[in-house]
Amino acid sequence: EYEHMPAVRQEDETFTRQLEEVNYMAAQIKSLIQRFQLVRTDETVTFEELLVRVGEGQTPYADRQKMIIDALKRRETMGSQFFPDFSFALLHARTAGVARPVFTVFKPETGKQFLSPDMKGIRAAIIMLMPEEEHVNENASMLGYLSQKLVEEDEFLNTIMTGEEEDIRGLLSRYLKKYFNRYLDKI
């Protein structure tokens, strides 16, 4: 009977770790949905000004704001994430400026396009930020899933363009529920 103890203990530890992983993912998803924001801003905002507003919207601390702005600028130098043909920009980065994943949408107050030349053709700037921490793969997978939905599901982009905050939050919740169910199936 004694020889079976280590296997049982290992199984318990594996299950405990799985529970911790599920709990972590559930908390990240809940936070992302609750903290989602639709921010209406001046249609004349430039790319630089938008980045400042993104930073200010995430944290009151100037050093963290700078981390967010720098991370988004760095990511943009790797290749533009502006898609004027689809009227949106996808600005995403990993940064120590945030403690949890972020999904925020900036749109002009007018509901039309941004007017600044460096924002030409853009009706919505979608911001996705993830923290620099040990759960990089989990957060990247979740935000990657949302990026995929932007491309695959016309309803998602249409709702971002024309909907209100609660409409977008509702879709986020629906998509992340599907993501979470898939996540549970893999564990």
Locate the predicted segments by residue.
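Cytosolic covalent-transfer regions centered on His/Cys nucleophiles
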Residues: 1-187
